[in-house]
Curated annotation (Swiss-Prot):
Gene behind this protein: pdxA
Record: residues binding substrate: 138-139, 275, 284, 293
Taxonomic path: Bacteria, Pseudomonadati, Pseudomonadota, Alphaproteobacteria, Hyphomicrobiales
Protein name: 4-hydroxythreonine-4-phosphate dehydrogenase
Single Gene Ontology BP annotation: pyridoxine biosynthetic process
Biological source species: Beijerinckia indica subsp. indica (strain ATCC 9039 / DSM 1715 / NCIMB 8712)
One protein family per Pfam: PdxA
Transmembrane segments: none
Length: 337
């Protein structure tokens, strides 16, 4: 048996959702790429395999060093040990805790350097809350537990990439939080994230916050007071940032090849264009961590969980991105002024 060398870890996600199923399907569909382990609950993964009716054995491992590459064997490092399976397609504290335990375990492995990075299957925010775990989402867990000071979300597919200035908060809060430091953080991380994807001199487009990028102050002055000065400061650092560009047209220009990355001001401004082009194509990359992290661009899909019809394409794309990404440099991992 060939032992795995510095593998990626795939966290199982919420056990009541489609995460375990799409992980099992990825294993079956990608026999050529198996330098990875699952971090999660062995019972959950055994059930996911059995539900697909395939002959795959779960190898329970206690350390990454025990993982080997062998046909028909899926390595699972136990982050929890459930006595019974949680109900499929329902929010539960048990599922929330198990999902959280998998993430924290994988973060520990990444910080120790025993794995190359993490690919996370979807979690359910209500399940986390039910378990008494109060994080808005994966990004915030990874930032705090991963010891990162500055993080940002990059959503990417084959045609466009976007980085968010603000992430999981209300629109009212996003307007308040989109200040000068937040602009600088997003622009810097967009630049370094694109470089991690192999783009040597990234062209960064910064979207405006208001309609028509404020129309010269007629529809709001954040572009004048905050965004334009941040772009100028980024350019002084050698970053090719331009804007602010109207949010309703900048993604089309990026898709046509004018820009490599769009810095979007708030969650839906950035995610709608990427997701409109197909959930199976989109990947979430967390910038600013001291290790690689990607995830599929969809949720737990409770409505189809346990039915064997979930599509693993987005998870596979996330895995491919994780293998392509360069291991973060000190600047990329948040060591910024």
């Amino acid at each position: 048996m060939v032992m795995l060398d510095h593998p990626l870890a795939v966290t199982m996600g919420d056990p009541s959702g489609i995460g375990p199923e799409i992980i099992a399907k990825m294993y079956l569909r990608r026999p050529d790429k198996r330098n990875w382990i699952v971090v999660g609950d062995p019972l959950v993964m055994e059930h996911a395999i059995a539900n697909l009716g395939v002959a795959v054995q779960i190898r329970r491992i206690a350390t990454v060093e025990e993982a080997g590459c062998e046909d028909g064997v899926l390595n699972v490092l136990a982050s929890s040990s459930l006595a019974t399976l949680p109900a499929v397609g329902r929010v539960s504290a048990v599922s929330g805790q198990a999902a959280y335990d998998a993430i924290v375990t994988a973060i520990g492995l990444a910080r120790q350097g025993t794995i190359r990075g993490i690919v996370t299957a979807p979690i359910h925010k209500e399940a986390l809350a039910a378990a008494g775990i109060h994080y808005p989402g994966h990004t915030e867990i990874l930032a705090e537990q991963g010891g990162a000071q500055h993080v940002a979300m990059m959503l990417a597919n084959d045609e466009i990439r976007t980085v968010l200035v603000t992430i999981h908060c209300s629109l009212a809060d996003a307007i308040r939080k989109a200040d000068f430091p937040a602009q600088m953080q997003a622009i810097r991380l967009a630049h370094e994230g694109a470089r991690a994807l192999g783009i040597v001199q990234p062209r960064i487009a910064v979207a405006g916050l208001n309609p028509h990028a404020g129309e010269g102050g007629l529809f709001g002055d954040e572009e004048i007071r905050i965004i334009t000065p941040a772009i100028a400061a980024a350019r002084a650092e050698g970053i090719d940032a331009t804007g602010p560009w109207p949010g309703d047209t900048v993604f089309m220009q990026a898709r046509l090849g004018k820009f490599d990355v769009v810095v979007a001001q708030y969650h839906d401004q950035g995610l709608i264009p990427v997701k409109f082009m197909g959930l199976e194509k989109g990947v979430n990359i967390t910038l600013g961590l001291p290790f690689v992290r990607t995830s599929p661009d969809h949720g737990t899909a409770f409505d189809i969980a346990g039915r064997g019809i979930a599509d693993s394409s987005s998870l596979e794309t996330a895995f491919d991105y994780a293998t392509r990404l360069k291991v973060p440099t000190p600047f990329f991992s948040g060591a910024m002024s």
